[in-house]
A protein has these predicted regions:
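N-terminal glycine-rich phosphate/pyrophosphate-binding loop and immediately adjacent elements
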Residues: 1-118
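Conserved redox-cofactor binding core of oxidoreductases
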Residues: 104-201
Length: 201
């Protein structure tokens, strides 16, 4: 059996890796952008918090033809897709959001999605919690507070002073407040489906 996958974004990388595990399936993965190995990205891609990219981007706008007023919608043109060009934030929705979606599409409720969240992640701070994973391919980390920029520290202090709750884990069910953002990074380096799923095969 032969399978052609158009686009090596997040879904394309995972699908190609999963299908290629079957020796009876030949997989051809097509991508118009370049392929960089983990950690060998050009400076523009290495900086996770630089959202607007001059290269490796499809140049989409929210309103086609409305230039120069159209809102830029960053979409990665590179193996790994937008997982290479985004800010690496690994933040889940709230359980009630998934339950609401399930009223339109069955199987998207929180209890149905939780096993999948757990399967794909290794949460390096909270992996032992029942709503986190500790054996998945995607590492989840939070910057230690002693490494925060002064602006972030000031924001957090001001929010707590105004009565917002401190939250250590924003991916915990019911989390609401201020605290460290979960990222899919390891040792300060972004991790993506390209290097976690595709490169090993």
């Amino acid at each position: 059996m032969r399978v052609v996958i158009a686009g090596a974004g997040t879904a394309g990388c995972v699908l190609a890796a999963r299908l290629s595990a079957d020796p009876g399936i030949e997989v051809l993965l097509l991508e118009s952008g370049p392929h960089y190995r983990a950690g060998a990205w050009p400076p523009e891609l290495a900086h996770a918090f630089r959202i607007i990219k001059e290269t490796h981007d499809w140049g989409f706008t929210a309103q086609a033809g409305a230039s120069p007023r159209g809102v830029h919608v960053p979409r990665g043109q590179v193996v790994g897709g937008s997982s290479i060009t985004n800010a690496t934030i690994a933040l889940r929705g709230l359980p009630e959001h998934y339950d609401e979606w399930a009223s339109f599409v069955s199987g998207l409720d929180w209890n149905a999605m939780l096993p999948w969240f757990r399967m794909i992640e290794t949460d390096e701070q909270f992996g032992a919690a029942p709503y986190h994973g500790d054996r998945g391919p995607i590492p989840i980390n939070r910057w230690p507070r002693d490494q925060w920029y002064p602006l972030l520290e000031g924001f957090a202090e001001a929010a707590v002073a105004r009565g917002h709750a401190w939250v250590d884990d924003h991916n915990a069910p019911g989390a609401m407040g201020v605290g460290p953002t979960p990222f899919n990074m390891q040792g300060g380096v972004r991790r993506t489906p390209a290097d976690l799923y595709l490169d090993p095969v």
